[in-house]
A protein has these predicted regions:
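Class I Rossmann-like S-adenosyl-L-methionine
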Residues: 1-227
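Conserved SAM-binding loop and adjacent beta-strand
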Residues: 228-236
Length: 236
């Protein structure tokens, strides 16, 4: 067969972090931070890996039910690495702006590299099947007439959280609140007074109350002052 393309560093890193969560019970954010530090990934690659880890782990309940519907087999019966690759594929296909062909091909390449060629046909078939519906369509097909279940699937939340939001907010506001809950927080970086200046934190929005901070999207470790311990991450 033709030589398999090498998986890109961002997807490999995301896979390694998510596999640590799956097999060792690691916390996704800590596993991601450790892997980003070790791989020295920055900029767009780090941002892509971060979205892939955050979104895949956040949507695990939804992705597993879609994988089961697409493959007619329980994800628990798949080996852990295959589960992780397929969840990543589902997140890219259904929740990110990754073109379907690229998401499927990169998932097959990743599986071939980190697990072995024997699983590439399976990953290819299930990923393609996942791509035949939108997230909305999968949620409706799987959830059926259970409106809470459909909303849970569509917003990547467990049903108990959807019910808790409904009890507090009422039905009309629930979906907007759940979707807002999925938005990644933007880090607030703050200098250690006397060790760094605010302008060393790069472009961002100056904090409202503190003269020492900046609200700045992206990976905090891209900032030299953070890497060197002269600045850190802190809520205002």
């Amino acid at each position: 067969h033709q030589k398999r393309r090498k998986a890109d560093p961002a997807r490999r890193l995301a896979y390694s972090a998510l596999l640590a969560v799956e097999t060792h019970g690691a916390y996704a954010n800590l596993a991601l931070a450790d892997h980003l530090r070790a791989a020295k990934l920055t900029g767009r690659d780090a941002a892509f890996a971060t979205e892939l880890v955050d979104g895949t782990s956040r949507g695990t309940g939804t992705w597993d039910r879609i994988i089961e519907a697409a493959s007619c087999r329980a994800p628990a019966k798949l080996q852990p690495g295959v589960r992780v690759v397929l969840r990543m594929a589902a997140h890219q296909i259904l929740a990110m702006r990754v073109p379907t062909r690229a998401a499927v091909a990169s998932s097959v390449d990743l599986a071939g590299q980190v697990i072995g060629e024997r699983v590439t046909g399976l990953v290819n078939a299930i990923s393609r099947r996942i791509s035949t519906h939108s997230l909305e369509e999968w949620a409706t097909e799987i959830g059926g007439r259970d409106a809470v279940d459909v909303m849970a699937l569509r917003t990547l939340h467990p049903t108990w959280i959807v019910k808790a939001f409904q009890d507090r907010l009422g039905t009309d506001e629930v979906e907007d609140a759940l979707l807002a809950d999925n938005e990644p927080p933007v880090p607030t970086l703050v200098v250690r007074p006397g060790l760094a200046q605010r302008d060393e934190l790069g472009s961002g929005t100056p904090t409202r109350y503190s003269p020492w901070g900046v609200v700045r999207p992206g990976n905090p470790s891209d900032v030299a002052a953070v890497r060197e311990g002269r600045a850190g991450i802190q809520d205002e």
